[in-house]
Every structure is written in C-alpha cells, then in structure tokens.
C-alpha cells in the first residue's frame, strides 16, 4: 500500500512538471478608461488606428498579451462627441470583425447585473486561411467602444479551450467589482 501511495505521488509530480507552462491570470484595471479585465501573461500597451465609414478615423489604445499561443487583446476607442451614434458605431465594428469570415457564434452579451447592465455582442469567427479562431466581444459604454478579442492561434489548436471565454467574460465597468489588488494598466505615452 505504501509503495502504491509513493508511486502515485511521484506520477502526479511528474505530470505537473511536464505540463505546458502557462502564465498566471491577473486582474487589471484602468481607472482612466473605466474598465477591468483578467488576462494571463505580461500585458503590453500600444496605440493604433481604426477607420470605419461611420466612425471615421480613430486612435485606439490596445492592451495585449499572448499566452500558450492564444492572443488576448482589449481595444478602446473614444467617441465622446458621437454618443448619439453609438448603435451604428457598435454595429459597424461588429460587422468589420466578422466580414468575410465564417461566423460560428453570434449572440448578445451582457455584463453587470440589474440597473448597471450593459449590453453588447459576442461573436466567434474562424479566421481565413486556417489562421485560427477569434472570439470577440463589443460594448459601447460612456462614450467609449470596447472590443475584446481572444484568438486561438493554429500553433495552439485547442479551439475548445475555456481561456478565451474566461477573458471575454471577465470585463467589468463597475470598477468596484474588480479584484482587490488589480494591476493598473499603463496608458501609452
């Protein structure tokens, strides 16, 4: 009996040691942009540009990490002067995300309970030329368009991984709901 217990403990230890290394998930918050999210790995910040026919050219702030060949990305765009056009801007961004891709899921998204509820959209697409699979979530809140994208790259290939869903569903706009000890996301300089 003792040998079986020792053998089981050794086997369990070896299984843990041979498992692929994955970064720990952390809670991040941006007080200035008004959201919190959970992501694995080291988050990098950059700026980018976006152009839509309705929205026009926009500067974007992008928070990105990659872990286990899954790319996690939050993109924030300001539309403070165009809040009356929020439905059109949101719809345009959703359309551009899924355009010319095979749509696997398209459903409404909701975060925050009760009177704090914010509605948006969740879409999963298969990328062209076996480029992987991306799940996106889109929310327009207080004059900002928030886009979350989790792309399972072909090198990972585990399209049933729960990690993209964990990331997409972790966003919160009521900052008191962020985990205690969340790391402040740095804005680009």
Residue ranges and their predicted role:
Residues 24-32, 50-53, 180-183:
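Short acidic/polar N-terminal linker immediately downstream of export determinants
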Residues 31, 38-40, 46, 64-66, ...:
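A structural detector for beta-sheet-dominated domains
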Residues 38-62, 94-141:
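Signature of long, low-cysteine stretches enriched in small and polar/charged residues
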Residues 48-50, 83-88, 114, 158-162:
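A short, polar/proline- and glycine-enriched secondary-structure boundary/capping micro-motif
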Residues 61-91, 147-149:
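A short acidic-to-branched-hydrophobic micro-motif
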């Amino acid at each position: 009996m003792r040998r079986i217990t020792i053998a089981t403990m050794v086997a369990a230890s070896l299984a843990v040691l041979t498992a692929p290394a994955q970064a720990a998930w952390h809670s991040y918050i941006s007080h200035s942009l008004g959201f919190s999210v959970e992501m694995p790995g080291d988050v990098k910040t950059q700026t980018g540009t976006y152009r839509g026919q309705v929205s026009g050219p926009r500067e974007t702030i992008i928070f990105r990490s990659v872990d286990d060949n899954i790319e996690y990305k939050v993109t924030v765009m300001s539309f403070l002067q165009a809040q009356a056009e929020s439905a059109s801007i949101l719809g345009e961004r959703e359309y551009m995300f899924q355009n010319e891709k095979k749509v696997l899921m398209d459903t409404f998204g909701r975060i925050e309970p009760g009177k704090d509820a914010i509605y948006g959209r969740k879409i999963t697409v298969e990328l062209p030329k076996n480029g992987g699979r991306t799940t996106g979530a889109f929310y327009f809140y207080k004059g900002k368009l928030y886009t979350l994208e989790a792309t399972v790259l072909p090198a990972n290939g585990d399209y049933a991984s729960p990690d993209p869903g964990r990331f997409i569903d972790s966003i919160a706009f009521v900052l008191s709901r962020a985990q205690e000890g969340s790391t402040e996301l740095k804005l680009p300089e």
